[in-house]
Amino acid sequence: MTSSGKVRIYELSKDLGLENKDVLDAAEKLSIAARSHSSSISETEAGKIRTLLKQGGSPVASAPAKPAPGKAILSVRKASSPAAPSMPSKPAAPAAAKPSPKPSAPSRPEAPLPLIVQKPVSRQAAPQKPVSRQSTPAAAAPAAAPSAPAPSAPTPRPKPTAPKASAPAPTASAPSAPPRPTSARPTPAPARPTGTSPVKRPGSEASSPRPTAPPTRPQPKAPVNRGAPARPAPKPELVGRPQPKRAAPGAPVRQIGQRPGVSPRPSGPPGQRANMPQRPAGSQRPGAPTRPGNAPSKPGQPRSGASSLELVGKPIRRDGSNDGAGGRSDGQGRPPGAPRPGAPRPGGMPGMRKPVAPGELMQLQKPNSRPSAPPPRRVDGTPVATRSGEAAAGGAKATPPVSRPTATPPAAPRRPGFRPGPGAGGQRRPGRPDWDDSAKLEALRSKSPQKQRQKVHIIGENDDALTAETGGFAGERQAMVLSASLARPSKPRTKHKPAPKPVAAIRKRRKETARQRQRRRAMELRAAREAKQVRPEMIVVPEDNLTVQELADMLSIESSEIIKSLFFKGVIATVTQTLDMPTIEAVAQEFGVPVLQDDVEEAAKKTVEMIEEKDHAHLIRRPPVVTVMGHVDHGKTSLLDAIRQARVAAGEAGGITQHIGAYQVEIQHNDSPQRLTFLDTPGHEAFTAMRARGTKVTDVAVLVVAADDGVRPQTLEAISHARAAEVPVVVAINKIDKEGASPDRVKQELSEQNLLAEDWGGDVVMVPVSALRGENIDKLLEMILLVTEVEDLQANPDRLAKGTVIEAHLDKAKGPVATLLVQNGTLRTGDVLAAGPVLGKVRAMVDDGGGRLKEAGPSCAVEALGFSEVPTAGDEFEVYPDEKSARAVVGDRASDARASRLAQQMASRRVSLTAMSGQAKEGELKELNLILKADVQGSVEAILGSLEQLPKDEVQVRVLLSAPGEVTETDVDLAAASGAVIVGFNTSMASGAKRAADANSVDVRDYDVIYKLLEDIQLAMEGLLEPELVEESLGEAEVRAVFTIGKSAVAGCYVTTGKLQRNCKVRVRRGKEIVFAGDLDSLRRNKDDVKDVATGFECGIGCDRFANWKDGDIVEGYKLVTQRRKLAT
């Protein structure tokens, strides 16, 4: 109970031991406003609900569901008969389903028992008299003896052959009905059964079949009920209103709560009406649903007044009042779920019905008397049986009598009678108008055009003549004769033509199927092709550009996928459009394929042949050059340390190699000393060019793979370099001593790259080693020498030297220093050489151990001093006989180098017009100016390449100067003038540079690990971006009451999630629409201003600029927080 003395629904349900839904249903029935289980109601209302639930049990079981306004509610109730207390509780359909001997009549397999549709209220009514419930028209014996007579043998009914062409009428049971001449009408039975002597009900199986209307039908014998006088076979006649709630067995039952009102008249022909059961042309199949509302009379069968249900009582109102005289109590012995044979089954479509006043329920009753001589009439929905004997009543058709079952099976329950209602004789209560002509017109439209049109009078469900025991026969005397032109006979013909429509559809489907077959085959072929295509591990891009189609072919995907990917990135591309390198990398990265530039692979190819023809006569064997490659942290330098017995890896910054290291090792092989030259390449992804240069000059590539990590991206790149240089590969599986090492897994992954181990049947040497413990190092060296012996490595030491610049840097004491690998000839001190556009004269040479050398033969790696400037790493050098010839070559190369360098600088500053305009709209073009100084040329290349990969959509990186060497005072002056940041990598500051930087407030950063350098540059770029505001959700509340205070309004809310804070941002959501967004100006709880309200508490919310609160509104609270922006990738 709340503090205000109210009770919540869930508390009440807990007290009563019921579900919340049951209590809510009871509250809804009592018109108590309760939205959910947490709604509050007063103690008085709670008491009403307790009383209702204690008296009637669960609302679901005690009361029908509350109807929508203007709809009647039907409830199915078990009827218990005082006259038949021993009636079984289960449905008696199996017992009642036994047909009388009727050989030719088709029977329905399952005939449900009649359905009593009524409101469960006590009725002040006279005792009802039971009559025989037969769905077949029984005119021969309106009154039956209490004992079941033996049925006479019926004449077999021939199967109808002529189909009907009429559409079903909404208020009639069949399109055509035989007319009933007055001369053929029998008089009512002199004595009717009383409520204590019920007549046994014949099996519904015999009356359920609905054959199609035959043009002629033989006259069957009419069975005579024992105890009733034999009478001539009368014509079928209407003994009650056409009842929308009754249909033949097998008809769909209207669900409880369905509106029994008049359905709107369909605009199209009957054959095209949606949501209406379509009857085949002429006949009703056994088991096929009949339109609810059709009369249950069968073709060719006389109708008995004692065997048909009628609406003879006034509709029962929900308030329990019973104005009419008809009413059947709940105690008539029918099982609760057993439907009556004439009731429509659930799921069926209701037919055309008349509107029912809100709160009314229909009641089915039987008449207790029949009019003596009603005028001829026609029951809608009964097929015409014969055309013989129609002389009476002006040529109207007469239905011959048929054999009717007179006895029920022994197990069939006795049906109690019904009480006669007042107004017997078919007198209509004065003051009630006839039903509208639309129903009559619809009934007339459904008639077959071949049949003679009859006078049709449609009696609605709610007509006051429901109180009449005859069900409105008296109203027929005022029936309106409709014009024949209103029948529109052409519409029913469409029901005969359902066949052409499927034919046309089939034809259309065949055409579509052919196209779909072609599409399906194309899709299957494409899917098979895609299944066969394996996505490559890496793609090589030639000339830094590809078209969309070429990229799709390389990635083994559809070009449309690439176009879609580019579209989501804001790039509109076609199949033939050329993509630049950054776009190609972005697309390939999305599909998980790394990209290798073709120029990098070209750098790994041996483009210059070091041995000329004149050298062939002087060739001798040279030591092999071995390049150690692999992924970062896989143990390359540690392996070289183990070979050289040195400790290089321990002294490297960050524990990673960032330069090419050249070492010479002398080992014993076959009792003779052998020399090996090792090049240690960096494994970081930024040093791709360095690895390519190392592979270009190598003779054997040693691929180091960690046994606990397997094949990684740089491993794949190293394999690509080795294949481009066409050098043999020796795999060293390192770290076999670590826990989790799996050499076999490494071999399996390498086999997927077409590197198959020798012990697996391949030709690739794979040696498991441990660099830290020194395991299998000798075996690895032996395998390297065996591989190089096969290669037959030779050179001419008696000529001028030729080779490659492995690395270059600027030493503040020594000047420009280059690491040279002599590949042919002998390099001596004092030689003049040209390394690309750089001229140099060798002043000194130093080996890897720091010792001075006078000369260096083939496969020797040395550091040379004496260059005019720092040469470019990767350039070939050649010694010339004199300085003049060397200067001529260098001059030509310098002009070319200058042009390419200018192009690179322009490319680094290039900004597209689209990007400039977009940034100009934001108010400022954001740029980060850098001056890059590094220790060696290779490091400058690596850093520039990594900077190119940073996203530049929002911030441009401009490298004003990049060179190896120290940071000088000139660099500081340039940075101060341009607002640049000086980035140094493994270098120092010259004298005066530090003082100049402090004086000009220039930011100078020095790094020794490339990871940290790139990370700080990216953070600096993000620092130029404006911070963004992000919504942070606080909570939600539901408006449950609105209070008006002056001109403003306050919403009484219940906080469902999170919490609400004063002065936070709120959105008011009504359904799916946001009706207000602004600030929460007032937040109160129990008339006290509070800062916040947590979940589960009620509060009052006020907004100065919003007062249109409504119950059920959702208030979302949030706040805006600033967040550092990231670079868009």
UniProtKB/Swiss-Prot annotation:
Residues that coordinate or bind GTP: 630-637, 680-684, 734-737
UniProt xrefs under PROSITE patterns: G_TR_2, IF2
Basic and acidic residues compositional bias, start-end: 431-445
InterPro entries, alphabetized: EF-G-like_DII (IPR053905), IF2_II (IPR044145), IF2_N (IPR006847), P-loop_NTPase (IPR027417), Small_GTP-bd (IPR005225), T_Tr_GTP-bd_dom (IPR000795), TF_IF2_bacterial-like (IPR000178), TIF_IF2 (IPR015760)
Pfam family, one: GTP_EFTU
Record field: compositional bias (Low complexity): 33-42, 56-99, 135-147, 162-175, 257-273
Domain tr-type G: 621-793
Gene Ontology annotations for the cellular component aspect, listed alphabetically: cytosol
Molecular-function GO terms, alphabetical: GTP binding; GTPase activity; translation initiation factor activity
Record region (Disordered): 33-462, 485-515
Bias (Pro residues): 100-112, 148-161, 176-191, 211-221
Entries under CDD domains matching the protein: IF2_eIF5B, IF2_mtIF2_II, mtIF2_IVc
Keywords: Cytoplasm, GTP-binding, Initiation factor, Nucleotide-binding, Protein biosynthesis
Residue segments, region G3: 680-683
Biased composition (Basic residues): 490-499, 506-515
Major subcellular location class: cytoplasm
NCBIfam families: IF-2, small_GTP
Protein name: Translation initiation factor IF-2
Protein's organism: Synechococcus sp. (strain CC9311)
Species classification: Bacteria, Bacillati, Cyanobacteriota, Cyanophyceae, Synechococcales
Protein's gene: infB
